[in-house]
């Protein structure tokens, strides 16, 4: 049974050699032109035309907001080494960390255990409409500021903070994505879908127009130009 509220997370990867241009509509994506490893069209086709039986089940585990003693106890229980990936390595997660209430010693512990550390902004300001309407400078202060805080207080290398999830999964349109691209982030994890649930949407790049439904506008519609 498909629930109306169900969604998958689309991780929109950025091409290093291109820049997002605000207000310039993206062109349609053609798989014959947009090819891995640097480009991939949005959709449900398995990368590399692999068969379903030839790929493992992929589970993306992530947590939002602050890291403190109470949830850290749960993380220690969940990631105690008893659950393994097919290659024998321990499972891991991505933590999208925000400023308030976070214990940065525990962030460092998670980082040293090879969990991924992303972030969820500094302030998680309310109302959520702030994130939809934020200026480029406002987005930059939140996005760069939290990465710098993780570096200073959590001892997380800035270059290892590659992912961002907007507060309340309220994306900021082309403005937000331009800041992320300009500052070297590799993916964004804030865009839910109701259209692509079975089969699910695969991670895709923003070199061309996305086919994903926009559940929480404004979604990016600009194009990446050389």
Stretches with model-predicted labels:
Residues 20-116, 123-128, 138, 142-202, ...:
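Active-site beta->alpha N-cap acidic-glycine motif
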Residues 220-226:
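A conserved mid-domain beta-alpha-beta active-site/ligand-binding segment of alpha/beta enzyme cores
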Residues 131-133:
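A charged helix-plus-loop insertion that forms the helical arch/lid used to bind
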Residues 2-19:
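Cleavable N-terminal signal peptides of Sec/SRP-targeted secreted and luminal proteins
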């Amino acid at each position: 049974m498909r629930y109306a509220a169900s969604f998958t997370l689309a991780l929109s990867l950025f091409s290093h050699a291109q820049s997002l241009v605000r207000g310039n509509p993206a062109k349609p994506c053609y798989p014959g032109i947009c090819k891995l490893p640097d480009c991939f069209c949005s959709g449900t086709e398995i990368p590399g035309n692999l068969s379903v039986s030839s790929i493992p089940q992929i589970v993306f585990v992530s947590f939002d907001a602050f890291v403190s003693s109470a949830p850290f106890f749960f993380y220690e229980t969940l990631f105690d080494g008893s659950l393994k990936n097919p290659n024998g390595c321990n499972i891991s997660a991505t933590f999208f960390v925000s400023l308030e209430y976070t214990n940065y010693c525990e962030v460092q512990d998670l980082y040293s255990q090879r969990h991924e550390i992303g972030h969820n902004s500094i302030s998680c300001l309310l109302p959520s409409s702030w994130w939809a309407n934020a200026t480029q400078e406002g987005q930059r202060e939140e996005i760069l500021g939290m990465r710098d805080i993780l570096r200073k207080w959590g001892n997380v290398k800035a270059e290892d903070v590659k992912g961002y999830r907007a507060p309340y999964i309220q994306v900021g349109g082309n403005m937000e994505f331009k800041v992320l691209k300009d500052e070297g982030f590799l993916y964004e994890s804030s865009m839910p879908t109701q259209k692509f649930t079975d089969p699910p949407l695969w991670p895709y790049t923003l070199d061309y127009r996305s086919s994903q439904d926009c559940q929480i506008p404004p979604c990016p519609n600009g194009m990446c130009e050389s």
